[in-house]
């Protein structure tokens, strides 16, 4: 089935993926393409509309990103945001100037609510501005549609040509009614129908995978994370027992995690899950290593070797499943590519294994869409809504050398912290929460005896997307319960500290 599509042309703005997500949330499929995509390719997709993103450039800079003026003559509805707004005005014959006062942050705005772009929203509202340049004079045929105190043309449009520009950012949550403005563009102006549904995506992918794979075997590296789990279940729905999932237990997972992964996919979905106990191998390779980057490299190398050994035992397998998602595609600069593409070998895998093709069933989806697909496929919420967990696992939540004793300590501490957060009902309010075993020991007193044991750190943050984060204001009584249980039930720990550093300057993980 060919979905209606809206194309987001990327001019280097920080919110390009957010714009695409907002469009998808309206049930309209969209893709992010480079601004210099040839006009013929854009036209060939027959888009219902085009959105120009913001960007750091000024239209008057020598190498400022531009667009073919002919695009405006094709009858395709266009919405320019921030730089995209200035670009439309500049190319169409208006004037863009440098503002005396830079507008940044929340700003009061007045809309012309007779415009189809602002239909159904209050005349006075709040928007999010982030600009230095502004449209001073409109091109012929355009009308001002909004204004702020410092920007007399905060939006403009031509209803006949269906070309519009907004100086503010409707895609960010700080703009009141921003989503409604995007909906108006999609449904009032582009005449979209909203045919992008999770259920139709699953059906289409299942049929596509069946056609490509046929009766051949497929292998998948299953980590228990959201992306690999959803990809595996989706492919299994298509080809059943011809899918072989290799789950490498490197001994660096949280308490009960390995058993849970095997139980869910083997018992609930009746999938071929090959569990490889490689704990001793990984610990031996990590012996004496304290540098976090070196830990990552060693774990990655050993994982590849173990996966390779197990995959070879399965015989001639031509297909590998990867949990690539759309942000990976966009950030790699690859742009749109086929869902299933030919490769000589997998990025990161040695050339000892040569897969004919990689199956990436989720490469068109954002993370929130992946979660929705997972829920529709029947994957338990505890896996679908799992918090971000680093590939190297607990190895980078142990500061210094990784040993079996330290892993046992951290598993118990982390389990106590996570259990208390969940029982307190805070798990849906906190973006991520976990424990870190520091390499610091301190003096304590327990049972009238002197102790000299480890200090553990608790880390909990609130965030929207993980790019920035604030430390979570967990009530003192909950922290007190966690601390008491840890020092009373976990041997070799006598001190608990709480990390109250935001990101930036700190990162969420310690290593």
From Swiss-Prot:
Binding site for ATP: 223-229
Any coiled-coil regions, as ranges: none
Residues at the catalytic site: 82 (nucleophile), 169, 171
Record-level GO cellular component terms: cytosol
The reaction(s) this protein catalyses: XMP + L-glutamine + ATP + H2O = GMP + L-glutamate + AMP + diphosphate + 2 H(+)
Domain GMPS ATP-PPase: 196-386
Principal EC category: ligase
Sequence ranges assigned to domain Glutamine amidotransferase type-1 in this UniProt record: 5-195
Top-level taxon in the UniProt lineage: Bacteria
EC annotation from Swiss-Prot or TrEMBL: 6.3.5.2
GO terms assigned for molecular function: ATP binding; GMP synthase activity
Alphabetic keyword roster: ATP-binding, Glutamine amidotransferase, GMP biosynthesis, Ligase, Nucleotide-binding, Purine biosynthesis
Pathway: Purine metabolism; GMP biosynthesis; GMP from XMP (L-Gln route): step 1/1
CDD domains: GATase1_GMP_Synthase (cd01742), GMP_synthase_C (cd01997)
Key word DNA-binding present: no
Keyword Nucleotide-binding: yes
Record text on subunit structure and interactions: Homodimer.
Job of this protein: Catalyzes the synthesis of GMP from XMP.
Protein name: GMP synthase [glutamine-hydrolyzing]
Lineage, uppermost ranks: Bacteria, Bacillati, Bacillota, Bacillota incertae sedis, Caldicellulosiruptorales
């Amino acid at each position: 089935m060919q979905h209606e599509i809206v194309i987001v042309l990327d001019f280097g703005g920080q919110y390009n993926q957010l714009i695409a997500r907002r469009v998808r949330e309206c049930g309209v499929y969209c893709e992010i393409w480079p601004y210099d995509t040839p006009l013929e390719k854009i036209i060939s997709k027959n888009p219902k509309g085009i959105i120009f993103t913001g960007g750091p450039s000024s239209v008057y800079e020598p190498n400022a990103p531009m667009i073919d003026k002919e695009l405006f003559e094709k009858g395709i509805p266009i919405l320019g945001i921030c730089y995209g707004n200035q670009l439309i005005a500049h190319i169409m014959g208006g004037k863009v100037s440098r503002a005396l006062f830079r507008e940044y942050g929340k700003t009061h705005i007045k809309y012309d609510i007779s415009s189809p772009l602002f239909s159904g929203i209050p005349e006075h509202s709040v928007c999010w501005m982030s600009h230095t340049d502004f449209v001073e004079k409109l091109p012929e045929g355009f009308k001002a549609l909004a204004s702020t105190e410092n920007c007399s043309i905060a939006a403009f449009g031509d209803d006949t040509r269906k070309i519009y520009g907004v100086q503010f950012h409707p895609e960010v949550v700080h703009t009141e009614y921003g989503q409604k403005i995007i909906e108006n563009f999609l449904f009032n102006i582009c005449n979209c129908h909203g045919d992008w549904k999770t259920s139709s995506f699953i059906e289409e992918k299942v049929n596509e995978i069946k056609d490509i794979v046929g009766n051949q075997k497929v292998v998948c590296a299953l980590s228990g994370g959201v992306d690999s789990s959803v990809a595996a279940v989706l492919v299994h729905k298509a080809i059943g027992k011809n899918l072989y999932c290799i789950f490498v237990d490197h001994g660096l997972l949280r308490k009960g995690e390995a058993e849970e992964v095997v139980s869910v996919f083997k018992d609930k979905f009746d999938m071929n899950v090959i569990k490889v106990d490689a704990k001793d191998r990984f610990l031996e390779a990590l012996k004496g290593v304290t540098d976090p980057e070196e830990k990552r490299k060693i774990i990655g190398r050993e994982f590849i070797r173990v996966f390779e050994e197990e995959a070879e035992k399965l015989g001639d397998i031509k297909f590998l499943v990867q949990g690539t998602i759309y942000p990976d595609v966009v950030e790699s600069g690859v742009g749109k590519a086929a869902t299933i593409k030919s490769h000589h070998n997998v990025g990161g895998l040695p050339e000892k294994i040569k897969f004919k093709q990689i199956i990436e069933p989720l490469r068109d989806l954002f993370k929130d869409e992946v979660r929705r697909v997972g829920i529709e496929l029947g994957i338990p919420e505890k896996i679908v809504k799992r918090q971000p967990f680093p590939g190297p696992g607990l190895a980078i939540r142990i500061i210094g050398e990784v040993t079996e004793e330290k892993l046992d300590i951290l598993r118990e501490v982390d389990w106590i912290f996570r259990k208390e957060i969940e029982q307190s009902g805070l798990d849906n309010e906190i973006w991520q929460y976990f424990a870190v075993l520091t390499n610091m020991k301190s003096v304590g007193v327990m049972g009238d005896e002197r102790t000299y044991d480890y200090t553990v750190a608790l880390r909990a943050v609130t965030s929207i997307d993980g790019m920035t984060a604030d430390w979570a204001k967990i009530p003192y009584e909950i922290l007190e319960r966690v601390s008491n249980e840890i020092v009373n039930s976990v041997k070799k720990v006598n001190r608990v500290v709480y990390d109250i550093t935001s990101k930036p300057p700190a990162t969420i993980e310690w290593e």
